[in-house]
Amino acid sequence: MKKIIGVSLLIFCAGCVSVQIPKYLQDKHPYKKEFYAGYEETLAATKRVLKDSGWAVSSTTDPSVYEETPQSRNSLGKNILILSENKQTRMLFFSRYTQLNIYVRALKNSTEVEIRYEAVTPIPFKQFRSYRNDSFVNKFFNQIGDLVGNR
């Protein structure tokens, strides 16, 4: 009987993990890449790669709503922040929740794309956060480069 109660409590605790991920991600480890293509073309390619990768766009906004940076002041007035929906990846005993913020900024002869990534892996009484995923971001940038015609 004690084993059944102990196992029941363990299962109950494992099911009570909640995750809070804000829509806006701070620049803990941003990835940036410059594409020698027009702003509209790069923005369309970025949205297409997001959709093809299984990400849903939560909303788009002006980045100055959240922060004012030298990059946004240097842009030619064309910049956008794309906020993704949380993406859940199921593991054996837990799930991982990831989110992206993507900035697209028009520069003089190019367009800069900045990706902020956050993954949260909750377990009972602890949450592990990661701000890096080099292979995912490099693949994402390569797909944008393929669509706009440069790397």
Q: Where are the language model's segments positioned?
A:
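Ser/Thr-rich, low-complexity intrinsically disordered terminal regions
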Residues: 17-151
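Sec-dependent N-terminal signal peptides
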Residues: 4-13
